[in-house]
Amino acid sequence: MSALLDRSTIFVREHVGMFKAANAYDLLDPATGAVVGLVQERVGGFFRKMMKFTQWKTRMSFHIEFHDLEGGRDEVVLTVSRPFTWFRSVVTVADGTGRVLGRFRQKLLSISPKMWVLDPAGNEVAFLKGDWKGWNFTFTDAAAHVLGTVTKKWAGIGKEFFTSADNYVIDISPACQGADLRRLLLAAPITADMVYKEYA
């Protein structure tokens, strides 16, 4: 069992770099500032890395791994991936064994970021909605009950953490029942960042 996946509040801090071919994020304990996980994009080959600096980066496939670093371990517990796309993104989330947990399907023709959250069978089980700035997101179930939030600011975090628009706090509500749904919520800010900010 991964302690990282059982957390209800996680701070996400992007690695900042002017010329970077792969995105990376630290996952921190909000109370202590300790790094408890790492999110790393895997970009293979010189050609693919060079394509990341062109207009084609908005269409390219991506594969991202969530590493649990708690207790001295380094275990891949989640993956987030998308194939090459022309228009609407469909992002697949799987656990460390490759079992599909669900998918995020981008909603087209929307001013603010919006994505349907699907179970492995393709049923709509939740909805991810962002504000027009793309900084704050609400994760709701099919009945519009809030299951969690992804926010740019949180009262429990020091201001020194917020040095980039791509730093977030994930807050999972007790109402978010089911391990798979909690893991999809954990993947939500990285998915939104890749689709709407890094790749939009």
Would you name each region that the model predicts?
Residues 1-77, 82-90, 96-101, 106-200:
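Low-complexity or membrane-interfacial segments used for flexible interactions
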